[in-house]
Amino acid sequence: MKPFNELVQHFSDAQGRAALLGMLRGIEREALRIDESGYLALDGHPLELGSALTHSRITTDYSEALLEFITPVNHQVESLLQGLTETHAYSVRHLHGQRLWPVSMPCYVKDEANIPIARYGTSNTGKMKTLYRKGLTYRYGALMQIISGVHFNFSVSQELWQSLYELSDKSLSFDDFISESYFGLIRNYRRLVWVLPYLFGASPALCNSFIKGQKTDLRFEKSGRGTLYLPYATSLRMSDLGYTNKEQADLNISYNSLPEYLAGIRAAIKMPSANFANIGVKVDGEYRQLNANVLQIENEFYSPIRAKRVTKSGEKPSEALARAGVEYIEVRALDVNPFSPIGIEASQVRFLDLFLLYCLLTPSPKSDAAEEARLSANLKSVVLEGRKPGLELHTATGTLSLQTWLLELFDNLSSLAVLLDGETNAYQAALAHWRDAVVDPQKTLSGQVLQQLVTKGQDHGQWVMSLAQQYHQYFIDYPLSSEAASDYDAEAQSSLAKQVELEAAQSAVSLDDYLTDYFGAPA
């Protein structure tokens, strides 16, 4: 592959710029429902929002209380965020006074045992989804599962792939070239993933109730009545306190090629876990988990980025990738942005565009175990002390200061921003905005959060509740068109009908037989 700056130059004509701008994006935003006192909602998913099993835009994640809003795929940043805003506005109007918790880390949970696991009806598909979540509860506890985040889906245009393929040696088929190039993007992303918690990490603090009873070596400082924080942390969500899986630490799944990745995932699905076997699979006639393997299903594999392809009915993610290769990637390292009603803002999306294009267009050597260890250490350093003055990160040849590394990255991104902007200024403005946070760590999202809590002496829970109320009013006042509202009404009804159809179609097959068929062997 040509050097990055040469590639940017190669795409500098109108046709090349159009190929770069043909990006497709989607956003998935998770948010807990809370009551007016700030406590986790314990009721079921609101019926007016439709079926969480079959609705394309409004579903649930781990819990009945953990809403997930999904945008359709979109070419335009503004319409992408408008669609996400409309989904929020419609949903809030059907929450009967409940609010959305606008940060990643949960707070007011009276009893972890009462966190309601998501339910999806009586079809075997729905029962399997609930049972998978029951397994997560037994394995890791419920509290960890209600940490919320934002996922960003990204793909580039066929025109860009054609141009890049023409520049390659064409030793691969076109489809294989696309998959291998996406894995090149993934490897470079993993080398630089620490950039995202540095800029966008927004969970340097949490309520002390979250770690009640947990052992931790982290030296928290206290603020307000019940706030714990680390002075230089960026994203406790991405730390060992958040969603990590010690059972997965030894999987060593390779991102060096699609075949190696698929082989690793398939091996993990079949790898037995002594710890999880102790839970039991079916005890006294009742399932506790889908199986006792390291991963119950592929979705349990934790990674800050995933290679994806839209699946056909009944198809596993790895089967879709094996069938037709990588279609898009899913970025999973984003905290909820508490300063945006929808958890993410346009300048973040544009930075992600630049960042991911850079990861794609930069040469990406294969990784080895020594590099993987460095990458893991760098990410851990940044999530726990990313704003620490003079922080050094590991490179192949020694160490480099985080700030120096970031400034070099921003310099590289600037030529791409100029090209994408053409006659406009949106990408350059986004880059300038976040460059300020490189120079002044207080301007990162985590820096801004700690200014609210520590400098102003606010309690974490109270501050988040005030934001929840503010955003609740924002969505109530949002000018949702009658056409948009009718469209959501119609999908709510059609999704419920689809669930009923699925339940009827699967009624003759027992859950045992369904799981045996799904896994190809007794669960």
UniProtKB/Swiss-Prot annotation:
The keyword NAD does not apply. Its EC number is 6.3.2.2. SUPFAM superfamilies: Glutamine synthetase/guanido kinase (SSF55931). GO terms for cellular component: cytosol. GO terms for molecular function: ATP binding; glutamate-cysteine ligase activity; metal ion binding. Pfam families: Glu_cys_ligase (PF04262). Keywords: ATP-binding, Glutathione biosynthesis, Ligase, Nucleotide-binding. Pathway: Sulfur metabolism; glutathione biosynthesis; glutathione from L-cysteine and L-glutamate: step 1/2. InterPro entries: Gln_synth/guanido_kin_cat_dom, Glu_cys_ligase, Glut_cys_ligase. The keyword Zinc does not apply. It is an enzyme of class 6 (ligase). Gene3D superfamilies: 3.30.590.20. One of its GO terms (biological process) is glutathione biosynthetic process. It catalyses: L-cysteine + L-glutamate + ATP = gamma-L-glutamyl-L-cysteine + ADP + phosphate + H(+). Belongs to the glutamate--cysteine ligase type 1 family. Type 1 subfamily. This is Glutamate--cysteine ligase.
